Each structure stands twice: as structure tokens, then as C-alpha cells.
Amino acid sequence: MMPRLQEKYEKEVVSALMDKFGYKNIMEVPKLEKIVINMGVGEAKENQKSLEAAVEDLAKITGQKPILTKAKKSVANFKIREDMPLGCKVTLRKQNMYEFADKLINVALPRVRDFSGVSSKSFDGRGNYAIGIKEQLIFPEIEFDKIDKIRGMDIIFVTTAKTDEEARELLRFLGMPFAR
């Protein structure tokens, strides 16, 4: 069964984007390529348990096992050594990606306190969009009394769009609530 958001993309978004930007070929239409969710756990250098908890939370949220991210080089001021695990990340593609995007847009973001939309300035110039989330509690899979600490995460939407404007329209048509 095709995820709801993927169906919406194929049935409505493609034609809307073709009209708006005047693409001649359906393959030119930008699409979501992947969603990368990254959780940096600063206190992992002293406390390995916190990293395990972060991995568990991320696995619950995404339904996929995260990989550990390690320090690229040693930095004495931060008390980190090379190859020390400092966080975790998940890369979602295809069905998992659409299901996660649907859950984020329709369930998680509306649960953010004082939510007025996501910033439309977080594009990187190459058609990718990044959003920071301050607490993992906005996801329905996370139970308040089961977590040890509130953690945030970065979510990056990687699209095939050439420009930020095309990427913004793609995400807007998919339902991303941009602030006015």
C-alpha cells in the first residue's frame, strides 16, 4: 500500500508543480529524495546511557535503527577523542520517508507549543530544507514518563529541486506549514 503523502505527491503535487514552473518532462519535477534525522548527544562523552536512550528514541520515532555518528577528530577543549560516539542519525528513503514526513507534518508539528509554522528561511541554496526540533516529545511514539531527558533533533529534507523556490513549493504542496 502506498503512503498517503506519496499518493498525494503523484496525483496532485506533480501536476501543480508542472503548471507552476512549466516543466516539459515529468522527470524534471522535483521530488523528495531522502530525509535525514540527526540527534547530537553532547553528554555522550561522559554518559553512554544517554546515547543509548537517544538511539532508542530515534528508533521509535522513525521505525528504523539509527547509526552512531562519531567524532571526526580529537578536540581537547571539548574533551572528545577521534571516533568517540557523539550522536546518532537515520536516513529515510521511499515509503519510510513519506510516512515520516506525513507524521511530522500532520501529527508532530501541530503538537509544538505556540506553533505558528516552520521558518521558510532554512533552505541551503541547493533545494534542501533543514528544520530543528527542540524536544522529541512532539512525536506520538515517545511517552513522557519513559524518557530520561528532553532532546532535540535536526531534520533535513533532501530534494532533487535545483533552487530553493522549487523546493519550497514542493514542500508547501506536500503540506509543510510555513510561517507567513
From Swiss-Prot:
Please list the disulfide bridges.
Answer: none
Its GO biological process annotations read: translation
Q: Kindly list the GO CC terms recorded for this protein.
A: cytosolic large ribosomal subunit
Per UniProt, the keywords (alphabetical) are:
Ribonucleoprotein, Ribosomal protein, RNA-binding, rRNA-binding, tRNA-binding
Instruction: Specify whether rRNA-binding is a keyword of the entry.
Output: yes
Q: Write down the InterPro entries for this protein, in alphabetical order.
A: Ribosomal_uL5 (IPR002132), Ribosomal_uL5_bac-type (IPR020930), Ribosomal_uL5_C (IPR031309), Ribosomal_uL5_CS (IPR020929), Ribosomal_uL5_dom_sf (IPR022803), Ribosomal_uL5_N (IPR031310)
Provide the GO MF annotations for this entry. RNA binding; rRNA binding; structural constituent of ribosome; tRNA binding
Is Nucleotidyltransferase there in the keyword field? no
**What Pfam families would the database entry show?**
Ribosomal_L5, Ribosomal_L5_C
What the protein does comes down to: This is one of the proteins that bind and probably mediate the attachment of the 5S RNA into the large ribosomal subunit, where it forms part of the central protuberance. In the 70S ribosome it contacts protein S13 of the 30S subunit (bridge B1b), connecting the 2 subunits; this bridge is implicated in subunit movement. Contacts the P site tRNA; the 5S rRNA and some of its associated proteins might help stabilize positioning of ribosome-bound tRNAs.
The entry describes its oligomerization and partners as: Part of the 50S ribosomal subunit; part of the 5S rRNA/L5/L18/L25 subcomplex. Contacts the 5S rRNA and the P site tRNA. Forms a bridge to the 30S subunit in the 70S ribosome.
The family classification in the record reads: Belongs to the universal ribosomal protein uL5 family.
Name this protein carries in UniProt: Large ribosomal subunit protein uL5
The species this protein was found in: Clostridium botulinum (strain Hall / ATCC 3502 / NCTC 13319 / Type A)
Q: Which gene encodes it?
A: rplE
